[in-house]
From Swiss-Prot:
Homodimer. Keywords: Cytoplasm, NADP, Nucleus, Oxidoreductase. Optimum pH is 8.0 for 9,10-phenanthrenequinone-reduction. Optimum pH is 6.5-7.0 for azodicarboxylic acid bis[dimethylamide]-reduction. Optimum pH is 6.0 with (2E)-hexenal or 4-hydroxy-(2E)-nonenal as substrate. Expressed in leaves. It catalyses: an n-alkanal + NAD(+) = an alk-2-enal + NADH + H(+); an n-alkanal + NADP(+) = an alk-2-enal + NADPH + H(+). GO terms for molecular function: 2-alkenal reductase (NADPH) activity; 2-alkenal reductase [NAD(P)+] activity. This is NADPH-dependent oxidoreductase 2-alkenal reductase. It comes from the Eukaryota. GO terms for cellular component: cytosol; nucleoplasm; nucleus; plastid. It comes from Arabidopsis thaliana (Mouse-ear cress). The keyword NADP applies. NADP(+) binds at residues 52-53, 163-169, 188, 192, 208, 232, 254, 260, 284-286, 330, 334-336. Coiled coil: none annotated.
């Protein structure tokens, strides 16, 4: 039995900001069966995740970025995190009807071979399935690992989160508040700033686009300095943060979205503060911490069910909307976690 299979194809390697014209939206056919003698599963993709790291994979293969993930192959569907339902299985640990989240191609149907720390069976369905693209998936685990494992927070510390209304930042802020920290976030619009203060419980927030002097803005928000910085932006923001860090401050480098579309990345000028203030800066990738995923679920699920942790999604309906949604991410058009709905069942 065959079915039509819509796909989002990368035309060629991307330079600068991606545009919708960098992608083709095509329709092909797929055999609705698993190849004999394999451990593969056939899945119907339900939700797809738009994430900043995907821009890195759109560029030409590079030894540095290869340490994070392989570049996409032009002419093939792009890949990312998604939520899928199994419709046929050749894998002993998965059966028809099971739900999983993990890496899939941007298409309606995919044949995948589930791998440890790349695909996870969904056991808890009393929460929105789309949460497994965000709050309960890679971004949520990123926030948890980066804050607790990398930053080693203590009650009463000051925490700054950039890109704070995004998929990762909105959870980092809530985790920090639960720790008894003083939390400030930045975002790129009044709507997002209001969200940080009214929805996510940040103590303060500011629109970085309205600040002519980021160093002064941070000094205003943190008159006694910053203990922890959760880095999602890079560039000028990192420069301003370094001046405002406290002694023995910690910086968890999760992302640098301000740099991904630049031909020549911006330099950072205030690095001497790392020495003077004994600042610890650590880059991290969420896959290094997936062995703690079950611990993460045990921690976060009760808080979600009790309404102590909330999450905002920006939902695009239909696979044909996926290129627009992904491109919009790099212009700050999304409010909250950007999700693409391929199918709800």
């Amino acid at each position: 039995m065959t079915a039509t299979n819509k796909q989002v194809i990368l035309k060629d390697y991307v330079s600068g900001f991606p545009t919708e014209s960098d992608f083709d939206f095509t329709t092909t056919t797929v055999e609705l069966r698993v190849p004999e003698g394999t451990n593969s599963v056939l899945v119907k993709n339900l939700y797809l995740s738009c994430d900043p790291y995907m821009r890195i994979r759109m560029g030409k293969p590079d030894p540095s970025t290869a340490a994070l993930a392989q570049a996409y192959t032009p002419g093939q569907p792009i890949q990312g995190y998604g939520v899928s339902r199994i419709i046929e299985s050749g894998h002993p640990d998965y059966k028809k009807g099971d739900l999983l989240w993990g890496i899939v191609a941007w298409e309606e149907y995919s044949v995948i071979t589930p791998m440890t720390h790349a695909h996870f069976k969904i056991q808890h369905t009393d929460v929105p399935l789309s949460y497994y693209t965000g709050l309960l998936g890679m971004p949520g685990m990123t926030a948890y690992a980066g804050f607790y494992e990398v930053c080693s927070p203590k009650e009463g510390e000051t925490v700054y989160v950039s890109a704070a209304s995004g998929a990762v930042g909105q959870l980092v802020g809530q985790l920090a508040k639960m720790m008894g920290c003083y939390v400030v976030g930045s975002a790129g619009s009044k709507e997002k700033v209001d969200l940080l203060k009214t929805k996510f419980g940040f103590d303060d927030a500011f629109n970085y686009k309205e600040e002519s002097d980021l160093t002064a803005a941070l000094k205003r928000c943190f008159p006694n300095g910053i203990d922890i910085y959760f880095e999602n932006v890079g560039g000028k923001m990192l420069d301003a943060v370094l001046v405002n860090m406290n002694m023995h401050g910690r910086i968890a480098v999760c992302g640098m979205i301000s740099q991904y579309n630049l031909e020549n990345q911006e330099g950072v000028h205030n690095l001497s503060n790392i020495i003077y203030k004994r600042i610890r800066i650590q880059g991290f990738v969420v896959s290094d911490f997936y062995d703690k995923y079950s611990k993460f679920l045990e921690f976060v699920l009760p808080h979600i069910r009790e309404g102590k942790i909330t999450y905002v999604e920006d939902v695009a309906d239909g696979l044909e909307k996926a290129p627009e949604a992904l491109v919009g991410l790099f212009h700050g058009k999304n409010v909250g976690k950007q999700v693409v709905v391929v199918a709800r069942e």
